[in-house]
């Protein structure tokens, strides 16, 4: 019995890919078999076609201009208004047409107190005004 020690050949650097191909083919077969089982129908409620035309868009109402001057006086469309009555006025505007509210444009003087501005914003929030803009 003669065994060869391999002398000058060095280590074997080739990878035997046959087991790798066998494993990949088995995984492919498993995937092919299980893929049709994994699909199942999903009930989807599709929207029905409406034959009625869309509602006509109404013209937006004119904006409300709210101005706060340097002496902390509030003007509702250029008429002086106490801060305590702002929420009531805003609620009346919102209740007149909740879906088509006018834009509230606030123009505050840079010397006005923050407290007045905070009260105006709180009144707008409490009356559920949706469109609020700030002017310079």
Curated annotation (Swiss-Prot):
Topology feature Periplasmic, residues: 45-136
Signal peptide: none
One Pfam family in the UniProt entry: ExbD
Record's keyword terms, sorted: Cell inner membrane, Cell membrane, Membrane, Protein transport, Transmembrane, Transmembrane helix, Transport
KW Methyltransferase (keyword) present: no
Membrane topology type: Single-pass type II membrane protein
Compartmental location: Cell inner membrane
Primary localisation category: membrane
Stretches in topological domain Cytoplasmic: 1-23
Record field: transmembrane: 24-44
Any one annotated GO CC term: plasma membrane
A molecular-function term among this protein's GO annotations: transmembrane transporter activity
GO BP annotations, alphabetical order: protein transport
Similarity annotation: Belongs to the ExbD/TolR family.
UniProt xrefs under PANTHER family: BIOPOLYMER TRANSPORT PROTEIN EXBD, EXBD MEMBRANE COMPONENT OF PMF-DRIVEN MACROMOLECULE IMPORT SYSTEM
Subunit-level organization: The accessory proteins ExbB and ExbD seem to form a complex with TonB.
Function: Involved in the TonB-dependent energy-dependent transport of various receptor-bound substrates.
Name of the molecule in the record: Biopolymer transport protein exbD2
Organism placement in taxonomy: Bacteria, Pseudomonadati, Pseudomonadota, Gammaproteobacteria, Lysobacterales
């Amino acid at each position: 019995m003669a065994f060869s020690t391999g002398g000058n050949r060095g280590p074997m650097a080739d990878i035997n890919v046959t087991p790798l191909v066998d494993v990949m083919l088995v995984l492919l077969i498993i995937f092919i078999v299980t893929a049709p089982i994994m699909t199942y129908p999903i009930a989807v409620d599709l929207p029905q076609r409406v034959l009625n035309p869309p509602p006509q868009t109404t013209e937006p109402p004119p904006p409300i201009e709210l101005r706060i001057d340097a002496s902390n006086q509030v003007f509702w469309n250029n008429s002086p208004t106490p801060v305590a009555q702002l929420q009531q006025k805003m609620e009346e505007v919102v209740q007149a047409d909740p879906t088509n509210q006018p834009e509230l444009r606030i123009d505050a003087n840079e010397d006005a107190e923050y407290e007045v501005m905070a009260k105006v914003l709180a009144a707008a929030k409490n009356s559920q005004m949706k469109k609020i803009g700030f002017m310079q």
